[in-house]
Design a protein with these regions (language model features):
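Flexible loop/hinge segments that line or gate small-molecule binding clefts
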Residues: 86, 109-153, 173-174, 195, ...
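Interdomain hinge and pocket-entrance segments immediately C-terminal to HTH DNA-binding domains
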Residues: 34, 43-57, 75-77
């Protein structure tokens, strides 16, 4: 019966599980792929979720994508990814293309967008979840951590350990708002103790171990009195740690180090770099649950989910 075939090919079709399995097995043997355009025309939506992220070249966003994919696995929804390279104009263009396909939802990194992109999100007519950050207003829902609080907590931990002459190493990409907020929170934490950053070293482009080595050598040559280096991410922090160890610098006695993100790469280092977990996989899962209508709150949209990262002192902050 044609109707049974149609229902069997739908994720939530009104047929028994045994019938569905027979239909799907027959389709597999025939190499048949259903044409979903007709259904999309009828519903004015496709079963796609637009996911817009700044990069796939670092270790952060692939784990976010894993969380999204895991949560959407049996919902009939499929994530489609667009990459912005931290460019607001590129984000605007990617969002325009995504929305032209009438997706069932949008997951987008960050809270800062161009006026045109913000207007498109506000008028999307589907669940919109801004991820990775909660330090600011959101269009619909947001899932992430407070980067200002993350920087603040790291500063307090460093000060408790007795470090006083502190340098910051990070990106100078003006559109990396989350790194900027962490630095603002970090400086606020230092100010609580009457301290301030004594030196800063910035880079442009992607994060890499080599960049971390070069930046660490540069800042310590310029300011050898520094006793702590706070890196904006784990990748450059790992490079800094390797440079210090190769040059016989006592870590964490002579100098302490910390990064951010809690990436798995740190498990392979000679010493564990102090870091803070950015809850990447959980952010992906919670965002996808909102889009799929599976939020534990029962709400569809209008949610603000703040996750709490964990500070791991590793082997590079002195024990208090």
């Amino acid at each position: 019966e044609p109707e049974i075939l149609i229902q069997g090919l739908r994720p939530r079709g009104d047929v028994s599980e045994a019938t569905r399995e027979r239909v799907l097995e027959a389709a597999r043997q025939l190499g048949y792929v259903p044409n979903k355009i007709a259904g999309a025309l009828a519903s004015q939506r496709v079963n796609l979720v637009g996911v817009i992220i700044p990069s796939l070249s670092n270790l952060v966003f692939p784990e976010v994508m894993s969380g999204i994919s895991e949560e959407l696995e049996d919902t009939g929804l499929q994530p489609v990814v667009g990459v912005t390279n931290y460019s607001p104009e590129r984000e605007e263009a990617v969002l325009y293309e995504m929305l032209s396909w009438r997706p069932s939802g949008v997951i987008i990194a960050g809270l800062e967008h161009t006026p045109a992109a913000a207007a498109m999100l506000e008028n999307a007519g589907v669940p919109v979840v801004e991820i990775m950050d909660v330090d600011g207003p959101c269009v619909d829902s947001c899932v992430g951590i407070s980067h200002k609080r993350a920087g603040l907590e790291m500063a307090r931990a460093i000060i408790r350990a007795g470090y006083k002459r502190i340098g910051f190493l990070g990106t100078k990409m003006p559109e990396d708002h989350r790194a900027r907020k962490r630095m603002e929170g970090f400086e606020a934490g230092l100010a609580e103790a009457g301290l301030a950053l004594e030196d800063r070293e910035f880079y442009s482009g992607g994060s890499a171990l080599k960049k971390g080595r070069e930046m660490t050598e540069t800042i310590l040559a310029r300011s050898p009195e520094l006793d702590f280096l706070y890196f904006s991410n784990d990748m450059i922090g790992a490079g800094g740690l390797l440079w210090c160890l190769e040059n016989g610098i006592d870590v964490p006695g002579r100098i302490g180090l910390a990064g951010f993100n809690g990436v798995d790469l740190l498990d392979g280092l000679p010493r564990r770099l102090a870091t803070m977990d950015s809850c990447r996989r959980e952010i992906g899962r919670r965002a996808a649950a909102i889009v799929a209508g599976r939020s534990p709150t029962g709400l569809v949209g209008g949610e603000r989910v703040e996750l709490t990262p964990t500070l791991d002192p590793g082997d590079t902050i002195r024990a208090v």
